Design a protein with these regions (language model features):
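N-terminal nucleic-acid-engaging modules of covalent nucleotidyltransferase systems
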Residues: 1-141
Length: 141
């Protein structure tokens, strides 16, 4: 069985492909809840982040020094956006969870996540329209 690629790797790989069909096929071939949620964070106006905008002032880890992956923190995402769970923790705790996540994952993943939450993630050829075609019904607004 092939090793599961990180979302960052899938996005970078997809952006290097030449045709729209190849990009759609690659996104679909690497479909995961995390990939789709990162795409929704970035492109769906219905997904509203309740964290401060921008990259917090934290020391990011090189990939070899990272102690965790973005996947390991996936359950915390529900607290970072306007959801039914967001009100269950205090803003201070929410921000601390986010900072801890950023300090444990590789720098590339941390930067990707911060750009996606701010709706500023950009990869050549990966557009809202392309993602809507790859995953119909995923992006609501």
């Amino acid at each position: 069985m092939a090793e599961k690629k990180s979302v960052l790797k899938v996005l970078r790989e997809t952006s290097r492909l030449k045709t729209r069909e190849e990009r759609i096929d690659n996104l679909r071939a690497n479909e995961s809840w995390l990939l789709k949620d990162i795409i929704r964070m970035n492109f769906d106006e219905a997904v509203v982040c309740i964290l401060p905008e921008g990259m917090p002032d934290v020391e990011l880890k090189k990939t070899k020094d990272a102690t965790s992956t973005i996947e390991a923190h996936y359950d915390n995402f529900r607290y970072f956006f306007q959801t039914q769970w967001a009100d269950k923790i205090k803003n201070f705790d929410r921000q601390n969870r986010f900072l801890q996540l950023l300090q444990e994952i590789p720098a590339g993943e941390a930067e990707m996540l911060c750009k996606a939450k701010d709706k500023k993630m950009k990869y050549v050829g990966i557009t809202k329209k392309l993602c809507q075609e790859a995953f119909p019904g995923l992006i609501v607004k």
